[in-house]
């Protein structure tokens, strides 16, 4: 035990985008970390970068949460005192095409994880949920900006997996009084570690706006596809609440600290800035960060997308003593720094840098 905190935090999906940044914050705050990741949409190089940035050793297990014996072995061999759960498939568009894969991986994997926690008496559980559990908040009964009390209704298989998992956790905490769970419904992550050593590294063509724009800027993609410009917004493009990944990582650790001090049973928190940006506003901010206009084409709407997802983060601001501190422009600047430094992300078979 090297940290000032007692026990070890298991981070599932810790080699992924948000997970890796959260591991850095955990280690900087004195926690010890064990990462479990099947590397289906991440690379082990991220683990090496975590160690490089923090100067601390991370225990890494390449384990799929569907592999119950392998997961049980991790719990048996480590003194795990809390779990932060990021692992899962995460693309809205892809989930519409392969729904069974999303239901099997995301839901069954989480059930296996909770069963291991129960077996090994691990209490505190931070679940990486999503604003997609709100479905379309502009429907009747919805509210913008979105409070935690907004009716939930997933509009894509991905969003429904997050909603079902929330329901599973809520049901389990009603009968399992030793489970203490935070449901973190975050909005649209972006940005990268200010060192430029960690960032979003999607395998294949990016599904999210910021890494897509970044690959256009660095020359890996020809142009940005804007999925629809006929939404009822100021410029016709959808509105999202973008949150810097470092702000998001700090929120996960704030939630964990809160659980260690308070028994909440099961409580949701929105993680966002409270300010929405359209696709074109983000594109303009990124163009400013790069220093030139970036090409785009308008294409038909994407299945499962909704017009506006903007958070009301008041509960997290007040209870977790957390709020965002980085702007959409800073998100773009940090993303661009990462993409310039590592045009091919963690794929070290490419040595090209962008000048």
From Swiss-Prot:
Which cofactors must be present for this protein to function? NAD(+)
Gene Ontology cellular-component terms listed:
cytosol
Q: Which residues bind NAD(+)?
A: 8-39
Which controlled-vocabulary keywords does the entry list?
Carbohydrate metabolism, Galactose metabolism, Isomerase, NAD
Pfam families, per this entry?
A: GDP_Man_Dehyd (PF16363)
Which InterPro entries does the UniProt record give? NAD(P)-bd_dom (IPR016040), NAD(P)-bd_dom_sf (IPR036291), UDP_G4E (IPR005886)
Pathway info = Carbohydrate metabolism; galactose metabolism
According to UniProt, the reaction catalysed is:
UDP-alpha-D-glucose = UDP-alpha-D-galactose
Q: Which SUPFAM superfamilies match?
A: NAD(P)-binding Rossmann-fold domains (SSF51735)
MF GO annotations: UDP-glucose 4-epimerase activity
Q: Name one GO biological process term.
A: galactose metabolic process
**Top-level taxon in the UniProt lineage:** Eukaryota
What happens in the null mutant? Leads to sensitivity to thiabendazole and microtubule-depolymerizing drugs.
Which EC numbers does the record give? 5.1.3.2
Catalytic EC class: isomerase
Q: What does this protein do?
A: Major UDP-glucose/-galactose 4-epimerase under glucose-rich conditions involved in protein galactosylation.
Q: Which PANTHER family match?
A: UDP-GLUCOSE 4-EPIMERASE, UDP-GLUCOSE 4-EPIMERASE UGE1
Q: Which family does this protein fall into?
A: Belongs to the NAD(P)-dependent epimerase/dehydratase family.
- What is the protein's given name? UDP-glucose 4-epimerase uge1
């Amino acid at each position: 035990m090297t940290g000032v905190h007692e026990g070890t935090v298991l981070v599932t999906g810790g080699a992924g985008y948000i997970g890796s940044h959260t591991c850095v914050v955990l280690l900087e705050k004195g926690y010890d970390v064990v990462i479990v990741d099947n590397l289906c949409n991440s690379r082990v190089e991220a683990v090496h970068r975590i160690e490089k940035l923090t100067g601390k050793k991370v225990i890494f297990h390449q384990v799929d949460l569907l592999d119950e014996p392998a997961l049980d072995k991790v719990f048996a061999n480590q003194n795990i005192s809390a779990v932060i759960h990021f692992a899962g498939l995460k693309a809205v568009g892809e989930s519409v095409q392969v729904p069974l894969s999303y239901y099997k991986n995301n839901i069954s994997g989480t059930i296996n994880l909770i069963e291991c926690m129960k077996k090994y008496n691990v209490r505190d559980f931070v679940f990486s949920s999503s604003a997609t559990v709100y479905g379309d908040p502009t429907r009747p009964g919805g509210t913008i900006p979105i409070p935690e009390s907004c009716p939930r209704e997933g509009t894509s298989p991905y969003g429904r997996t997050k909603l079902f998992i929330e329901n599973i956790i809520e049901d389990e905490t009603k009968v399992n009084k030793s489970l203490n769970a935070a449901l973190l419904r975050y909005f649209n992550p972006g940005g990268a570690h200010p060192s430029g050593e960690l960032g979003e590294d999607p395998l294949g063509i990016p599904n999210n706006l910021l890494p897509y724009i970044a690959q256009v800027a660095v020359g890996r993609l020809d142009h940005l596809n804007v999925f629809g410009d006929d939404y009822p917004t100021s410029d016709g493009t959808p509105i999202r609440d973008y949150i810097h990944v470092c702000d998001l990582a700090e929120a996960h650790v704030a939630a964990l600290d809160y659980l260690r001090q308070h028994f909440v049973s099961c409580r949701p928190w929105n993680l966002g800035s409270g300010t929405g940006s359209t696709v074109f506003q983000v594109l303009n901010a990124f163009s400013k960060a790069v220093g030139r206009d970036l090409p785009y084409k308008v294409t038909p709407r994407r299945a499962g997308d909704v017009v506006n997802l903007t958070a009301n983060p008041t509960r997290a601001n007040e209870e977790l003593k957390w709020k965002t501190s980085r702007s959409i422009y800073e998100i773009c600047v940090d993303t661009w720094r990462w993409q310039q430094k590592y045009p091919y992300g963690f794929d070290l078979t490419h040595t090209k840098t962008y000048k």
